[in-house]
From Swiss-Prot:
Cofactor: [4Fe-4S] cluster
Gene Ontology biological process terms in this record: iron-sulfur cluster assembly; protein maturation
Similarity section: Belongs to the NfuA family.
PANTHER family from the UniProt entry: FE_S BIOGENESIS PROTEIN NFUA, IRON-SULFUR CLUSTER SCAFFOLD PROTEIN NFU-RELATED
Entry superkingdom: Bacteria
Species this protein is from: Klebsiella pneumoniae subsp. pneumoniae (strain ATCC 700721 / MGH 78578)
Function per UniProt: Involved in iron-sulfur cluster biogenesis. Binds a 4Fe-4S cluster, can transfer this cluster to apoproteins, and thereby intervenes in the maturation of Fe/S proteins. Could also act as a scaffold/chaperone for damaged Fe/S proteins.
SUBUNIT field: Homodimer.
Protein name, per record: Fe/S biogenesis protein NfuA
An annotated Gene Ontology molecular function: 4 iron, 4 sulfur cluster binding
Coiled coil regions in record: none
Amino acid sequence: MIRISDAAQAHFAKLLANQEEGTQIRVFVINPGTPNAECGVSYCPPDAVEDTDTALKFEQLTAYVDELSAPYLEDAEIDFVTDQLGSQLTLKAPNAKMRKVSDDAPLMERVEYLLQSQINPQLAGHGGRVSLMEITDDGLAILQFGGGCNGCSMVDVTLKEGIEKQLLNEFPELKGVRDLTEHQRGEHSYY
């Protein structure tokens, strides 16, 4: 479910050494399955462990996950990275905003999952997002851009070199990708 690197385990063990005896960590998702989902890690004293929690035992600690957060933390990774600028704890949870779909799910669900878990996080850095509107009978994924992508001059490159390549590589049953967005600068433009 969750992978915690050795460096992150050592970091947590150091922090836990200063806490009440038996205190471990809790990994959770607030607003799971929504675009506003946020992941977090907190201390989990012994009296805060619930019967429905999943206990993930690691070499140096135990991480508790509540029942509601568990499916959204599938494939999550926690790491502690040190570089020239300092140290940073990172928590990557690709399924926090949307539950992972099975390989045999309908094509529409699988494409939507890839857009939400892999492509939109990249576009979000520029204030943008993309939505799947439909998949046509002839295998075209019809997308609509929003936010910072609406009216962006690089949208054609993003669509053809980024999104289309990734979708066609992942889903051979797709024949192409089309953009439904009106990109001429106007009242609807983001900037």
